[in-house]
């Protein structure tokens, strides 16, 4: 039997050794992960992130060292975490960070860790969404927490948190944070730690028979947090911090007083709050400083706890100041983000052996992302092998394309960039001399395709050199046969080196907008690429020259020497092609006979400790920068000129610019316009009363527009309307009425606009200002045939009417009483006869001011509302009155004589004077007479 036990123990130990998982570097696994019968150890500085593994079961022990991390998380809405450790003979020890995060999931999560012991000296996080009830249980027989345990839900549910073996004990000397969670106590609580309730959290002491250490603390941080204690005969005192602002402390049964004590009592001296139900009570040390009048019995109805009606007390006031214990001062940190939970991209290198037996190293890019459903997938893109591709090099000189060639070039794909920003030769040489070559053939070459010079650059600014330098040892590769040509676009300045070129090639460019010279020669182990990242001023000149040299017979191959000249600076580099002799570029200082110090550069050959100067670079001569050419440009512009009469005219044309000189090449003639420009013409209208019985309009000073409209006579003039002819688009008129050389009415100003419609009809809009009050109206010009009958006489006439859509009418009466016409109604006009209404259309001359004179008529007869008499001695004026909805104008009075109509503008205009006669009192009497006659005949019959 003993032998059998020894065999089992040996097998168990061997199994642990064989299946142990040790994490020594950062590791990310996505999808299903099988842990087998493995002990898991994560060492300092390393982390293991398991993503979207629906069920994770630890069978062996779990040991997370200090500075290490274990992350199990879900990134799918449909995938919740189920994490368990079911090996009762193994332990859980955390000295780093352990995080189980299922907050994004919309299903129920479960965390169940059971072992022989549980020890947390670091940080542990257990997070769920809370959309469904979740459970968390750390039920080891030996349970100790000295740092931070955080239990988090997005929202509160009926799920609870259990710590320790039921009816056992836990030791808490650290911080236990609850966020929208319910902690249900099922064990004794030892230690001097802290339970902190954040958000909508509750601390539920469900079994007070299991003692809680008097040094244990309970901290309520929010108004939604609460604490509830079972009410039994065993009374305990609980240390509570943060009570106030509406949070609650209660019992599992309703609060009720007895004959001697009330349902609750607060001792202001000791700070003890006592809650009781008859003879059962529990005490809470909330501290001093509370106002007894602000306590109130309430009901705590949160999820996951017994809902007791009126079983709790709330304090509706500020929390008195009180020092928190050190354990409660440990911050409740947010849930950490697990590594690898966001899409990422990285470069990988693979070494393999091809069919020829050669070792081939391949590189590629790995993309890790998720699909629409949240599932992870990985895509690996490998860099292809070297190939040769033709490239076109175009050389530009000034503004003319000089030549185009198509060489074959071999270049290396860009794998790794080593950018170096420098502004001096010394910095560049320092970087080159201190760089250590890499064992891997990581190359970065940009392929230029053209050289371009622009003569339009005039700005001057500082420049810096962006140097991309890549080195590789010859042992890593000897040829460029395993790399692909890379040809970037939009390169302003570059020089191509043919694959078989052995001659020198030089390109000079000024005012570089973006210069990126680079070159590659195959079968070389040293490659140098220089580029100017910032635009250069027009005064700088770059010269890039390439020379292929051959060493002594002891050399293994050709050596490439490159130099870059910028003004008086020269950079040169050489490569080592022999293990015996080494050549390199160096800079040194020498003192001349006159004591001046000169800096020189050249190529140094080193063999052992012997140094020999092979070549000394000559100082770069002064470079003559050709002056930029002045380009003449032509463009269209608009300008204003002032005429001799001080009027301002706007002109446009073609302008030629040479440097800062502007010359007008062509002036565009004014474009003809079908629209007559608008203008304003004021008139002064003076009126007086004449005794003549007829109205005569003389058009001698005007151009006749219509033969039938040239002149007209009428008796008993009662109204006249000034209308702008269709040739005008807008005209303003103003008038003042004079009676015996005195102003008899307020000034009247009119603004009239004429519009011609597609059907040939005309419309007029008039705005009348009387004493600065605007009276806008819209009119239409209508030509109609009117039949007028007086007694037995009838006549027809073609009349031009001005109709109004809506207009307010004001009539100014005599000095004894003014008659006001409201609502577009006007008094009847009394006269002796009824005649036709005609219109006269006249065009004003474009010459100097003309005058329309000798317009006379009969005395106006206006009916007075009070006396029904006719006034002919007082002056009366009225604007046009129109019935609502009517399209024809109603007669109104106007001044009898119109004189001194003086246009202030010399432009051509036309006016139409329409005058109408109204009905008279005699016609009304005739109608009454006829009515009586007819009525008498009917009675007689």
UniProtKB/Swiss-Prot annotation:
Keyword match Secreted: yes
Membrane topology field: Lipid-anchor; GPI-anchor
Pfam families referenced in this protein's UniProt entry, alphabetically: Hyphal_reg_CWP, Hyr1
GO cellular component terms given for this protein: cell surface; extracellular region; fungal-type cell wall; side of membrane
Signal peptide range in chain numbering: 1-20
Residues modified by glycosylation: 36, 367, 686, 732, 790, 818, 825, 884, 917
UniProt cross-references to InterPro entries, sorted A to Z: Cell_wall_rpt, Hyphal-reg_cell_wall_N
Lipidation (GPI-anchor amidated asparagine): 917
Subcellular location field: Secreted, Cell wall; Membrane
PTMs per UniProt: The GPI-anchor is attached to the protein in the endoplasmic reticulum and serves to target the protein to the cell surface. There, the glucosamine-inositol phospholipid moiety is cleaved off and the GPI-modified mannoprotein is covalently attached via its lipidless GPI glycan remnant to the 1,6-beta-glucan of the outer cell wall layer.
Family listed: Belongs to the HYR1/IFF family.
Role according to the record: GPI-anchored cell wall protein involved in cell wall organization, hyphal growth, as well as in host-fungal interaction and virulence.
Name of the protein this chain belongs to: Cell wall protein IFF3
Organism encoding this protein: Candida albicans (strain SC5314 / ATCC MYA-2876)
Lineage: Eukaryota, Fungi, Dikarya, Ascomycota, Saccharomycotina
Gene this protein is translated from: IFF3
